[in-house]
């Protein structure tokens, strides 16, 4: 468990670190101290599921990114179903240029785009190096903290219900 990869960003409500670099796009090529440390801590590990919990200050509805093994339905829809009881789900057809349906964006779509840009997020890095299945959960900072925590706990509960041994 990596509790907070970007403490500066968390404290200052920004996705960039102190140097102004987006850590969650620095897992390939131009790395940061934070992404280097995360890769070092995760090196050689293998997981059934990678879960990355985020907050989004730009959008009012919950959404997630999911990469699942070929032919498997994933758990994103179940997660979104649980979170609908907590707050609104992002409902537009696209988010930041990525197609989104039912609050779920395909991590494979991001992977193709990031490869063109020479960047990689923790999720796309994790799907390539660490796990066959991955989720990045995005709770809106516009929600009350209590609701954001409840939503992220729901993500973990659903995840554990599918992967607990």
Q: Where does each model-flagged region fall?
A:
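Structured catalytic-domain cores with a bias toward divalent-metal coordination
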Residues: 1-165
